[in-house]
Amino acid sequence: MAITVNTNVAALVAQRHLTSATDMLNQSMERLSSGKRINSAKDDAAGLQISNRLQSQMSGLDVAVRNANDGISIMQTAEGAMNEVTNIMQRMRDLSLQSANGSNSQVERTALQEEVTALNDELNRIAETTSFGGRKLLNGAFGKSSFQIGAASGEAVQIELKSMRTDGLEMGGFSYVAQGRADSDWQVKENANDLTMSFINRSGETEKIQINAKSGDDIEELATYINGQTDKVTASVNEKGQLQIFMAGEDTAGTISFSGDLASELGMSLKGYDAVNNLNITTVGGAQQAVAVLDTAMKFVDSQRAELGAYQNRFNHAINNLDNIHENLAASNSRIQDTDYAKETTQMVKQQILQQVSTTILAQAKQAPNLALTLLG
């Protein structure tokens, strides 16, 4: 091997290894101190991109979980108010049944009506004041709202909260009354016992309710028979002996058309639209009609509560799934991004030894040109 003065190849090689060991040592110390295997793109460009996408998705999942929890809170608030609405309407129904009893005087019915009116006011107060974060929930202002329960676009669920005001369409229905009064001797005639009720449902389809009454039945028995044949309408008799028919507003897109011999005899005609807000239980007929109206209203409220309960369960399952996805993504990101301390500590010790060895060898290599002096001496 040649002995040179201008170029110390051994020193250059030792210096290169020393620089490499120092760089690797610095990288190990950076990874150990930060806890991350990838601290810049130069460490692992592809891994950095994947890790960033995973972190973005996890962040979105965290927001989605909060959104779903907010949705559950809104539905719990609304459902709690609806529970009280049901309790109040049940009390109003009890009062209506009490008023329909013949043992009550007009004074007593008037007193019962006063409580019904007060309860109606409370129902509307609940509908107007129930809110979440400033948003009214039960007066119709909430309408349909989307809840983003996923980490990507298009993963939203629409929830609709309908009005619980007592003057709403769903809180009542159409009332019909016979123009003719049935006295105590009135009976269904054998050859004039057919009653057909035709109406258009919410789907735009024509429906018919065919009643073939039993001949010999009086007006009260006729009402009972109609109620036993269909759940689409409710029949009752007022204090004047007139047949009353009630159909829920949400079941029809229009009014009922009556036909048949029995319908002609009774002279069925539209009385008007009755809702919870205009109940009048000061008469037997009004009290009977109030029961039908309240049954319709409670059925509507119960259906809304059932829907909210279903959505709450759905959101809970969505949260469970989001948490599971987040857990798996976090594990994947950890494998890509996080430092393996056992491996990196070993690497650091290795580079420290190499650094020390390279430093020693470099010091010795720097003495090699001095051999030329011995040749000159």
UniProtKB/Swiss-Prot annotation:
Q: Which GO terms describe its cellular component?
A: bacterial-type flagellum; extracellular region
Which SUPFAM superfamilies does this UniProt record tie to the protein? Phase 1 flagellin
Molecular-function GO terms, alphabetical? structural molecule activity
One Pfam family in the UniProt entry: Flagellin_IN
Q: Does the keyword Ligase apply?
A: no
Q: Quaternary arrangement and interactors, per the entry? A: Heteromer of multiple flagellin subunits including FlaA, FlaB/D, FlaC, FlaE and FlaF.
- Its biological function? Flagellin is the subunit protein which polymerizes to form the filaments of bacterial flagella.
Miscellaneous note, as given in the UniProt record, is:
V.parahaemolyticus possesses two flagellar systems: a single polar flagellum propels the bacterium in liquid (swimming), while multiple lateral (peritrichous) flagella move the bacterium over surfaces (swarming). The polar flagellum is synthesized constitutively but lateral flagella are produced only under conditions in which the polar flagellum is not functional.
Family designation: Belongs to the bacterial flagellin family.
Question: Which named protein is this?
Answer: Polar flagellin F
